[in-house]
From Swiss-Prot:
Pfam families with a match to the protein in the record: PPDFL
UniProt protein name: Pancreatic progenitor cell differentiation and proliferation factor
Keywords: Developmental protein, Differentiation, Phosphoprotein
Source taxon at top rank: Eukaryota
Task of the protein: Probable regulator of exocrine pancreas development.
Length: 116
């Protein structure tokens, strides 16, 4: 919790996003073309925006699987896309059920044909 000094106002210990003292421009925290070089340089402890990072595509909207978007958005492939999705879902569900084992029989699985 922040300590409130006796004067009644909070004082920031680091003003990384403020302009340099003596600036005649506005109070904005962004640099401007009129006053180049006034903004305080990037703090070394903060990460820089680098489009080379793996997570950059989440923010800039780059699709990592462009062929999937084309197939799923195409009306002529809508039935085959839905069929393959349901098949994959069904297969995954069967595999998940197959991996479950009853508590009394540790060596046997519950999926598959039962011997008669």
């Amino acid at each position: 919790m922040a300590a409130i000094p006796s004067s009644g106002s909070l004082v920031a210990t680091h003003d990384y996003y403020r302009r340099r003292l003596g600036s005649t421009s506005s109070n904005s925290s962004c640099g401007s073309a009129e006053y180049p070089g006034e903004a305080i340089p990037h703090h070394p402890g903060l990460p820089k925006a680098d489009p080379g990072h793996w997570w950059a595509s989440f923010f800039f909207g780059k699709s990592t699987l462009p062929f999937m978007a084309t197939v799923l958005e195409s009306p002529e492939h809508s039935e085959s896309a839905q069929a393959s999705t349901s098949t994959i879902t069904c297969d995954l569900a069967q595999k998940a059920v197959g991996k479950q084992q009853p508590s009394g029989q540790p060596g046997k699985t519950t999926a598959g044909p039962r011997p008669e």
